[in-house]
Design a protein with these regions (language model features):
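A short, N-terminal "cap"/entry segment at the start of jelly-roll beta-barrel domains
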Residues: 1-38, 46
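Surface-exposed loop/turn positions
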Residues: 30-32, 43, 87, 93-95, ...
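Conserved short histidine dyad/triad with adjacent acidic residue
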Residues: 36-57
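Short, conserved beta-strand element in jelly-roll/cupin
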Residues: 55-73
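Short acidic-glycine-tyrosine-enriched beta hairpin
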Residues: 75-94
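Ligand-binding loop in jelly-roll beta-barrel domains
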Residues: 92-118
Length: 121
């Protein structure tokens, strides 16, 4: 087992391209995965991902940091939050999200299960 490891998101282990989105995944070993989510203006989870996964809201847990753009997130409990550059965030399962404005949203995510399965199930 390696005690030090690095991967570059510009050379990902896996790339997925759902509508208006690109997800680059890196596998750091020991069941640790991370994702770079690049989301285009006009992207909305309930329009672009919901048809693929078949749930009413996103059922993934998100732990990440925004490096560019803005994302609005609403939860089925009635709460909402907007994240922007420099914001660390968590979104519990049961949310919808969309890009705010005309800038691309880029977030790096560190929940291994979400990084492995986002836009797949």
């Amino acid at each position: 087992m390696a005690t030090l490891n690095k991967k570059n998101f510009d050379n990902p282990d896996e790339t997925m391209t759902p509508e208006k989105m690109k997800v680059d995944n890196v596998d750091l070993g020991n069941s640790i995965k991370a994702a770079r989510m690049t989301t285009q203006p006009g992207w909305k989870w309930s329009e672009c991902i919901k048809p693929m996964v078949g749930t009413e809201t996103c059922q993934k847990n998100h732990v990440g940091v925004c490096v560019s753009g803005k994302l609005m997130v609403t939860h089925e409990d009635g709460s909402s939050i907007e994240v922007g550059p420099g914001d660390a965030y968590t979104f519990a399962p049961g949310h919808d999200a969309w890009v705010v404005g005309d800038d691309i949203f880029v977030g790096y995510e560190f929940d291994s299960e979400t990084a492995s399965t986002y836009a797949k199930e």
